[in-house]
A protein has these predicted regions:
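Short, solvent-exposed alpha-helical surface patches in well-structured domains
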Residues: 42, 158-161, 211-212
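Fold-level recognition of mixed alpha/beta catalytic cores in primary-metabolism enzymes, strongest
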Residues: 64, 70, 91-191, 195-197
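Gly/Ser-rich catalytic/binding loops embedded in alpha/beta enzyme cores
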Residues: 1-108, 218, 223
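Short beta-strands and strand-loop turn motifs
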Residues: 19-23, 52, 140-143, 195-199
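Short, basic, helix/turn surface patches
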Residues: 75-87, 127-137, 250
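Generic structural signal for helix capping and beta-alpha/helix-loop junctions
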Residues: 58-60, 110-111, 204, 237
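Amidase signature
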Residues: 165-250
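Amphipathic alpha-helical segments in well-structured domains
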Residues: 36, 120, 210-214
Length: 250
């Protein structure tokens, strides 16, 4: 398969046969998976081998990676800093060179946040294209309305490879739909329109981050892309954030 012989790790929240799946929750300390979850099966069928599982915060609900079962995962670039969360163990393992491929999950940044903190690649796919079956504490529960599963890696090419392995309907859905992801339809940066949103009063970032994002936009403009520093999506960020919080807690 496309991952023949590749060793990898995976977020603790995925089910691997005969291994603990606790989500960092003491109530599930002895929760042992009876079988591989769907994502794990697909990786195995593609040829991958699992070395182990990576750390998470309690119930996958934080932007750090500590729980009372496994302890704390720190950022391999600076052990006094956090790796992000909730896929913090995934990103830390990649950044440390311990693994070359990972899978995490994301609602409000749980793949993207640790990928950013640790300097690796992460992708939050469109909801539904990767089944959540097997990313669960209790089997056969309905999929979350907000959460998605997705890959982390050390390059964009590896993200695509992992996404191709993970994506597609589960068996119970396969009669109803199939996945046909389009290929990228541009050949050069000159064909791209880029909007740069470097900070916002609803979610301000540090000056260092704002400056670096602006530099990226300026570089893309020099390379021929059509770049706007003023364009914004047609919605109110404050309302969107409030609506998200209501959905998250519902």
């Amino acid at each position: 398969g496309p991952l023949h012989g590749i060793p990898m790790t995976i977020k603790e929240s995925y089910a691997i046969e005969d291994q603990k799946t606790t989500w960092g929750n003491e109530a599930f300390r002895e929760n042992t998976a009876a079988s591989d979850g769907l994502a794990v099966r697909r990786f195995r069928e593609a040829g991958a081998h699992f070395m182990g599982k990576t750390n998470v915060p309690l119930d996958l609900a934080d932007f750090q990676s500590f729980n009372s079962i496994y302890g704390t995962t720190n950022n391999p670039w600076n052990l006094e800093r956090i790796p992000g969360g909730s896929s913090g163990g995934s990103a830390a393992a990649l950044a440390a060179g311990f693994t070359g491929l990972e899978a995490g999950s994301d609602i409000g940044g749980s793949i993207r946040n640790p990928a950013h903190f640790c300097g690796v690649y992460g992708h939050k796919p469109t909801h539904g294209i990767i089944p959540q079956t097997g990313h669960e504490l209790i089997s056969n529960v309905p999929d979350s309305d907000l959460s998605v599963c997705g890959p982390l890696a050390r390059s964009a090419e590896d993200l695509k490879l992992a996404l191709d392995v993970m994506a597609g309907p589960a068996e119970r859905e396969a009669m109803g739909w199939k996945l046909q992801l389009p290929k990228p339809n541009f050949k050069s940066l000159k064909e791209l329109k880029v909007a740069v949103w470097s900070t916002d009063e609803v979610a301000p970032v540090s000056n260092e981050i704002e400056e670096r994002v602006t530099q990226v936009g300026e570089t893309l403009a020099k390379l021929g892309a059509e770049v706007s520093f003023d364009s914004r999506p047609n919605f109110d960020p404050t309302f969107a954030h409030t609506n998200y919080q209501l959905l998250l807690q519902s």
